[in-house]
Amino acid sequence: MANNASWNNVYKRINAKRKEAGLTWNQLASKAGIKMGSWMTGLPISHPTEEEVHKIADVPEMNTTYAYLRYGITDLSELN
């Protein structure tokens, strides 16, 4: 399992994309079909589940991929 520092980076990437999309946390959660979570506050007491990260990446307004949100990968060839 990833350490807290890497989950903090996941939060930062999700938050940046959310802001770019002009969405509130409530709107993002609704569009992704997930519940509001304490991790959305930015406090390192919890983190999104893998399933939540996948669902957030699938929100069209986010214009991103799971690989970017989870690992910061922008070039999918880096996955090989």
Label each residue range with its predicted role.
Residues 2, 16, 68-80:
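Short, charged recognition helix plus adjacent turn
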Residues 51-66:
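DNA major-groove recognition helix of helix-turn-helix/homeodomain DNA-binding modules
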Residues 20, 31, 59:
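Residues within the alpha-helical elements of helix-turn-helix
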Residues 31-49, 73:
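Recognition helix of helix-turn-helix/homeodomain-like DNA-binding domains
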Residues 1-23, 27:
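A short, Lys/Arg-rich alpha-helix, primarily the initiator
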Residues 28-29, 56:
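Short alpha-helical "recognition helix" segments of helix-turn-helix
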Residues 27, 38-39, 66:
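Residues in the helix-turn-helix
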